[in-house]
């Protein structure tokens, strides 16, 4: 288990020795009430083998819906409106 603590949030990464999948749990410290699953604070994330090429392709496709340059990540939106996180 890895953990990242900041002033705004805590992230815990859970994994095992059987696969290379990782579960990321995020707690936003300033969230005003208990989490409700209907808030859509969940999503899938994918690690790109070539982040720059993936970003270029997604930009050409006009499917980038949010970008956080400080964290080095961005999100694309699928045809059903779900956000997918792209990691380097």
Regions found by a protein language model. Name each.
Residues 1-22:
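Core segments of cupin and vicinal oxygen chelate
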Residues 39-43:
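Eukaryotic phosphotyrosine signaling hubs
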Residues 22-24, 83:
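Short hydrophobic-acidic sequence motifs that mark active-site Asp/Glu residues
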Residues 5, 30, 70:
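Residues that form or immediately flank small-molecule/cofactor binding pockets and catalytic motifs
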């Amino acid at each position: 288990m890895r953990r990242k603590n900041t002033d705004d949030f805590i992230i815990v990464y859970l994994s095992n020795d059987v696969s290379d999948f990782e579960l990321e749990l995020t707690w936003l410290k300033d969230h005003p009430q208990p989490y409700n699953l209907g808030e859509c604070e969940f999503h899938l994330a994918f690690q790109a083998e070539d982040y720059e090429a993936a970003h270029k392709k997604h930009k050409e496709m006009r499917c980038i819906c949010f970008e956080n340059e400080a964290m080095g990540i961005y999100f694309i939106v699928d045809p059903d409106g779900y956000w997918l996180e792209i990691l380097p």
